[in-house]
Regions:
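Conserved beta-sheet core of the metallophosphoesterase superfamily
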Residues: 13, 90, 95-161
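Active-site metal-binding loops of divalent metal-dependent hydrolases
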Residues: 17-19, 49, 64-66, 87-88, ...
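Short, active-site-adjacent cap segments at secondary-structure transitions
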Residues: 19-22, 53, 90-91, 124-125
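Short, conserved active-site loop motifs that form the nucleotide-linked donor/cofactor pocket
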Residues: 43-44, 58, 114, 133
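Beta-strand-turn-beta hairpins that frame and shape the catalytic cleft
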Residues: 51-61, 77-82, 130-133, 155, ...
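Binuclear metal-dependent hydrolase catalytic cores centered on His/Asp/Glu-rich metal-binding motifs
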Residues: 54-108
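Accessory, non-catalytic peripheral segments of nucleic-acid enzymes
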Residues: 157-180
Length: 180
């Protein structure tokens, strides 16, 4: 799957809380050996916090859950700065509608970034009114507690103020269903 994605376009990846030991960040995560074995020039994997200047106009800012002490604000505000983060943000919602009032961080961590692309929460949702900070959700229904409207998001970002987002739903041929 990872190789197939990287064959299509540059792939930027960060690990999440299930990919390693958050209490021992120096321990090997589950993704690094896979990335090393693939040895693909189009895969950019970042376990540590920092910036990845993808183009002259675009910077990905990694806010790693394994390296929170080294989070930084954007260093070039002329670029489009996109924060990448895998974790819960206060007031995000789960598939069953439960609001996580106390996430690992507040939405304010993204205030200096132009956009925020998030992972961890499986329900697709925007966390701000403008739609700049989003969870795309998961690509497949994981269990009976999740809805079946899974898929992925497509951002089209022309500049800091002109962007669109759309959710593309994937057909699940074998959904979890409950018969009462």
């Amino acid at each position: 799957f990872i190789k197939n994605l990287a064959d299509i376009a540059p792939l930027i990846m960060i690990p999440g809380n299930h990919d390693g030991n958050l209490k021992n960040s120096s321990r090997q995560d589950a993704i690094t050996p896979i990335i090393q074995a693939l040895d693909h020039s189009n895969i950019h994997f970042f376990k540590n916090s920092g910036e990845f200047h993808a183009t002259d106009d675009l910077c990905f800012n990694i806010l790693s859950v394994f390296d929170e002490d080294n989070w930084i604000d954007p260093t070039d505000t002329n670029k489009i700065n996109i924060a990448l983060y895998h974790g819960s943000i206060s007031n995000c919602k789960t598939d069953i509608g439960w609001v996580m009032e106390h996430g690992e961080h507040e939405l304010a961590i993204f205030r200096k970034f132009d956009f925020g692309l998030l992972g961890d929460i499986h329900k697709a949702q925007s966390l701000d009114f403008e739609g700049r900070v989003r969870y795309p959700g998961s690509t497949v229904q994981q269990n009976h507690g999740e809805t079946n409207d899974k898929g992925f998001g497509i951002w089209e970002i022309q500049d800091k103020d002109n962007f669109t987002y759309r959710h593309v739903e994937l057909l699940n041929p074998k959904p979890f269903v409950t018969i009462e």
